[in-house]
């Protein structure tokens, strides 16, 4: 699973997910991309599940680019713990994804293969997604 090697601070505020993606909103490396249509926190294990299902679908060919990285720690207090006594321990890591953000890209595969791989990967994610080509990414937003 993905997580940062080290961070400046161990814990973060939750923050807000307003507006569209500020960067990473176009297909930069591959031929096809999977973009988010709504805001969400994407966990590192969800990213890994998408990577596995896409690589299994492609078998030998194709290159997968993961364009998001889980750099935000999410904390959780133990069960049946009274309030107070500080913020809980880091439970998992998430990537803050806003609408229009390209999450995955693929290269070296046909359009049908990419479409099916992104459909399978989309089922692993908690948000609506859409496939875009390298040339016509503007029309999807």
From Swiss-Prot:
GO terms for cellular component: cytosolic large ribosomal subunit. CDD domains: Ribosomal_L16_L10e. Coiled coil: none annotated. Transmembrane segments: none annotated. Pfam families: Ribosomal_L16. GO terms for biological process: translation. SUPFAM superfamilies: Ribosomal protein L16p/L10e. One of its GO terms (molecular function) is tRNA binding. The keyword Translocase does not apply. Keywords: Ribonucleoprotein, Ribosomal protein, RNA-binding, rRNA-binding, tRNA-binding. Disulfide bonds: none annotated. Part of the 50S ribosomal subunit. Contacts the CTC protein (RL25). Binds the 5S and 23S rRNAs and is also seen to make contacts with the A and P site tRNAs. Interacts with A site tRNA mimics, and is probably one of the key factors, along with a helix of the 23S rRNA, in positioning tRNA stems in the peptidyl-transferase center. Belongs to the universal ribosomal protein uL16 family. This is Large ribosomal subunit protein uL16. It comes from Deinococcus radiodurans (strain ATCC 13939 / DSM 20539 / JCM 16871 / CCUG 27074 / LMG 4051 / NBRC 15346 / NCIMB 9279 / VKM B-1422 / R1).
